[in-house]
Amino acid sequence: MDATLPSIHTALKILGPNNVSVSENTALPVIQPLDILVRVACISINHVDAKSADMSPSPGATSGTDFSGVVVAIGSDVPKESFRSTNGMKPVQIGDRVFGGVFGNNPLRRDNGAFAEYVAVPARLVWHIPGGMDFSTASTLGAAVATVGLSLFQYMQLPMPTTTSTASPDNGPFVLVYGGGTATGAMAIQVLKIAGFRPITTCSSASAGHATELGATATFDYRSPTCGAELREHTGDTLTLALDCITDTASMNICYEALGSSGGRYVALDSFPLRAHTRRSVVPDWVCTYSQFGHPIAWAAPYNLEARPEDLLTAEAWYVVAQKLIDQGLITPHPKEERLGGLAAIGEGMEAVRRGQIKGKKLVYPISNELCAAA
């Protein structure tokens, strides 16, 4: 550890189900040889942060996924690593502004999470913040970009875009994004458009305009009793791919009704209700964004997953592509609401997210006023 770094920092710790508390005497995360250490400027709250703290708490673990900040230390093997330079990415150096996501509430690594003054992250799995983007905005992107990459290019096996789309969205295959008003749904719409597909989405009327601006070729009100039938009619019974960003019985039923008579693939962002798997011609699966790190997920069932090395490989490839898209300004961040109070206020924000009180935006909390003011 660099002698100029503190030996302890402040972090938001999991105490029990839906119970978090600020600890001011926590050891800094251990920097693995291929990790970097980031001083956190801002964080944003994801649904998984609140849900996992309630459903599968890891007492003593640091909470939080999404962060932005400044690199303050690098692991011993990072300078020898050629992955980033070989793939046309800027090497990570001390002083760089970066953003990304980590596995918070991790029972196998309780010292590390985004809701803290410092966070450790693999050097391969972090993005540089482009010029003109502030820490607050950057903190909203990590989990959404990573989850969309795994969902589309690993679990749906779609071809990854290079830089910009070469296919016309007017002629590409349809892909349904259920929940286009969510952060991940909005990201999926954009990436699908860039990749040359025709994204269609379900959302509220309040989110429909934004979804269209992002690239959705059609929007449908999920509250309509004929939503599934309308989707199937619009796609001419040809829909074979559905990404469910809500994942409950109602959303799964609509996705299954929308998929064409030949069937297809249904990918959820949570463990899906088995009772809603009603068609043999549809292959269901679900994504946990933390599988991108290539380690087991030791949460309670059904969220206990073995390591998936193939997810790590896809994530590494996607991070390279996504950095180019972000640098070119092709990715629009989700709307956000910035709240004050730092780490001590995050618990209240997590509760608001858990209760479904935050819609169409992400909650952001500045952690280091010094870094945010200097940016």
Curated annotation (Swiss-Prot):
Record-listed NADP(+) binding positions: V48, D49, A50, K51, S204, S205, A206, S207, Y222, L269, D270, I358, K359
- UniProt key word Transcription: no
Under the heading SMART domains, the entry gives: PKS_ER (SM00829)
According to its UniProt entry, the function of this protein is described as: Trans-enoyl reductase; part of the gene cluster that mediates the biosynthesis of ilicicolin H, a 4-hydroxy-2-pyridonealkaloid that has potent and broad antifungal activities by inhibiting the mitochondrial respiration chain. IccB collaborates with the hybrid PKS-NRPS synthetase iccA to assemble the backbone of ilicicolin H. The PKS portion of iccA and trans-acting enoyl reductase iccB work together to construct an octaketide, and two methyl groups are introduced by the MT domain of iccA during the chain assembly.
Q: What is this protein called?
A: Trans-enoyl reductase iccB
Q: Which reaction does it catalyse?
A: N-[(4E,6E,10S,12Z,14E)-6,10-dimethyl-3-oxohexadeca-4,6,12,14-tetraenoyl]-L-tyrosyl-[ACP] = (3E,5S)-3-[(2E,4E,8S,10E,12Z)-1-hydroxy-4,8-dimethyltetradeca-2,4,10,12-tetraen-1-ylidene]-5-[(4-hydroxyphenyl)methyl]pyrrolidine-2,4-dione + holo-[ACP] + H(+)
Q: Gene symbol?
A: iccB
Family according to the record: Belongs to the zinc-containing alcohol dehydrogenase family.
| A molecular-function term among this protein's GO annotations | polyketide synthase activity
Q: Which organism is it from?
A: Talaromyces variabilis
Q: Which PANTHER family match?
A: HYPOTHETICAL OXIDOREDUCTASE (EUROFUNG), TRANS-ENOYL REDUCTASE APDC
* Pfam families given in the database record: ADH_N, ADH_zinc_N
A GO BP term, please?
ilicicolin H biosynthetic process
